Swiss-Prot record:
GO annotation, biological process: cell wall organization; peptidoglycan biosynthetic process; regulation of cell shape
Statement: the UniProt record of this protein carries the keyword Methyltransferase: no
Reactions catalysed, as given in the entry: 2 D-alanine + ATP = D-alanyl-D-alanine + ADP + phosphate + H(+)
Protein name from the UniProt record: D-alanine--D-alanine ligase
Enzyme class: ligase
Domain ATP-grasp: 140-345
Length: 349
């Protein structure tokens, strides 16, 4: 049986570039090689595509390497002399693209739309679901409308609202949590106990972003739970996994807590009781379906007084060997090689 040729897109132009490189190392090593020929395509922070020219591409171990060191080793191993134009991947015979990207243009619908234009199927959600999930403000409006608990929130838009006036006259009380509306992986996020602290955070975010989400801080147990879809004939059967409780050693599960070894404790399955687990599974499945996600997703919650409040849904969650979805799949006896096969089969269907 001939193998299906796929591209594994990784790296990218977002602040989560290095996380994508780590995730994709695991993806590359895990995809079923009896079914698929995998070609890793590196996208550098400037958006240049580095496409291997050898018949059996190699993905170097990124551990302990700088971006430059990794790229040099990647290019040497794969006989790459210079970057290609992005559209060149349409001439390489790829039948699908596995998205190992995270955040920014890799997760907000832009790369999805680009691949759609080239006629290359891809894993994960489409343009609309990706952009809606990345837009935390509009996603919250949808979640709230569908009866999923959401902490009080509002949005500040640069040049459109007076942030200082708004922060001094909030309809809900401090402390609040502040993050870029279109951000990911807890980059540039923080807690503010006063309007002045909030303004400092907003000013920092406005340097690089135009929209800021301000949300009432809900204290409680932080959990995250994934959804997978299993292809059955022509249908996709979505089902929830088990929740993971996250206990950061810092005040919040920020970027460092997520991706620094030992910076947080993750317990899978989360010890939150059967009733709360069932509610989390119901809510995460509903979030997945409300946004129109495809293949997989992961939704984060805070449990306060027994009530799970949704924080956000991620359409391209982390996929290192120790990331949350692999943990949750393992707890249910699901092999990640099978998961990646499901994602590719769905993309090709």
């Amino acid at each position: 049986m001939s193998k299906i040729k796929i591209a594994l897109l990784f790296g990218g132009i977002s602040g989560e570039h290095i996380i994508s490189v780590r995730s994709s190392a695991f993806i590359f090593a895990t995809i079923d090689r009896e079914k698929y020929d995998v070609c890793p395509v590196y996208i550098n922070p400037n958006g240049k595509f580095w496409i291997p020219t050898v018949s059996e591409p190699i993905y170097p171990d990124p551990s302990g390497k700088t971006e430059i060191e990794f790229l040099q080793e990647f290019n040497k191993a794969n006989a790459i002399v210079s970057p290609s134009e992005p559209a060149d991947i349409s001439q390489m015979g790829f039948l699908s693209a596995f998205l190992g990207l995270h955040g920014g243009a890799g997760e907000d619908g832009r790369i999805q739309g680009f691949l759609d234009t080239l006629g290359i199927p891809h894993t994960g959600s489409g343009v609309l679901a990706s952009s809606l999930a990345m837009d935390k403000y509009r996603a919250n409006i949808l979640f709230e409308a569908m009866g999923i608990p959401v902490a009080p929130f509002l949005e500040l838009e640069k040049g459109k609202t007076d942030p200082r006036k708004t922060l001094l006259n909030l309809s809900f009380s401090y402390p609040v949590f502040i993050k870029p509306t279109l951000g990911g992986s807890s980059v540039n996020t923080g807690m503010a106990k006063t309007a002045e602290e909030a303004m400092t955070l907003v000013d920092k975010i406005f340097v690089t972003d135009d929209r800021v989400l301000v949300q009432k801080l809900v204290s409680g147990t932080e959990v995250s739970i994934g959804v997978l879809e299993k292809p059955e004939g022509k249908k996709r059967n979505p089902f929830p996994l088990v929740p993971t409780e996250i206990r950061p050693k810092s005040e919040f599960f920020d970027f460092e807590a997520k991706y620094t070894k030992g910076a947080s404790e993750e317990i899978t399955p989360a010890p939150v009781g059967d009733e709360v687990t069932k509610t989390l599974q119901e809510y995460t499945l509903r979030c997945h379906e409300i946004l129109g996600c495809k293949g997989y997703s992961r939704t984060d919650f805070i449990i306060s007084d027994g009530v799970p409040y949704v924080l956000e849904t991620n359409t391209l969650p982390g996929m290192t060997g120790t990331s949350l979805i692999p943990q949750q799949a393992k707890a249910l006896g699901i092999n990640m090689k099978d998961v990646f096969t499901w994602l590719l089969e769905i993309s090709l269907s």
